[in-house]
Amino acid sequence: MVSTPSNRTSDRPVRRRTRTFRPNYLSFAGTYQCNLTCPHCCVPIEWPERLEIPSALRFLEGAHRYGIRILGFTGGEPFLYPEFLIALCRRGAELGYRFDKIVTNGVWFQDRGHLETVLKGLTKAGFSGKLGLSVDKFHGVHTAALADFCISARQIFARDNIVSLSYASRRPDQGLEPIYALAKDLNAVVDWSELLHRYLLVSPELTITLNWNHLAPVERAEKLSGAWDGRWFQEDYCEGPGQALIVNPRGEVKPCCGFASDLDQLTIGNIYQDSVAAIVRRARKHPYVGKIFRQGLSAIRDEILARDPAAFPGATSNHCFFCWHVLTRGLAAGVSGGGGQVGNWTGARPNFTGELIQIGIKGKA
């Protein structure tokens, strides 16, 4: 198997490597809604909430004052709420944020004119990051539309590296078939880069980096087998997907962008009522979140196994699946169980001690 970084590898600059929660990345999901219903998706796309633009702008400015300098966007499908993207990008550019990427399925547009209008709005707003295109078997076959997206983005942004690709699979050398199909439409080749330790899609007009995501069978994908693969995850203190403030459409703030992040147990604040400093303090004191960034996910695993050696059906190399399993099943100390599809997206249930714990985070009234 080819060794490649996944979304757990971060190239974000870190001022100091103190083992604590010290976010250096801000990401907004303006809407849960999406034009696709992917079978592996962990986002509750049924929920109608949208982030209010003035409140998001205030939080963006507060994060900048706190010292956070990198900005990204996710969803749902973020391009279904283009006015949010453009307003936040414009203010982010004015403040001097470094843009990461806008994660998109790339097939949200009605026609080429609609696509070009929205992308031109982004360029005028000052967006200088990447368009992170999700291309894998779970998103369905939309090769022609994806090719249109890549070509239009290249022309409008005048950058050969404007697009990056993400794909979810069990292993980095699996699940590449839709990408090979896209490469054919773009007159491109897909090959391994020894320098970057990942695949590249390259054409005369485009240079696209491929990012592998370790598929976590959670939420809608819980029925997929193979999560307990017999190997324990390598400890990384969640430095890649974590050390972030991820704001969902309800205004709730999460400490990571992992597959388990929409669970209520990982809420560390709300932008409608909390400052950035207050959210960071709460995360550090949080009985689960704080421990992950201080001691690692392996410390939570070891604590559970010391209490019950038969607590898990096996070992898993997938960090996000392990986190989701522990939280929904109520195996972790200090937080309740429930949530996700196990709890029909809402609600809580007692943890292993029989306690139903309220961490103290309330949503917008």
Per-region residue spans from a language model:
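Canonical Radical SAM [4Fe-4S] cluster-binding loop centered on the CxxxCxxC motif
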Residues: 17-53, 66
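Radical SAM/AdoMet-radical enzyme domain recognition
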Residues: 26, 53-73, 81-192
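Active-site-proximal cofactor/substrate-binding loop regions of enzyme domains
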Residues: 36-40, 44, 77-80, 101-102
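Cys/His-rich zinc-coordinating "finger/knuckle" motifs
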Residues: 41, 45-48, 245, 263, ...
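A C-terminal junction/extension of Radical SAM enzymes
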Residues: 161-259, 297-317
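Flexible mid-to-C-terminal extensions adjoining Fe-S/redox cofactors in radical SAM and related proteins
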Residues: 258-365
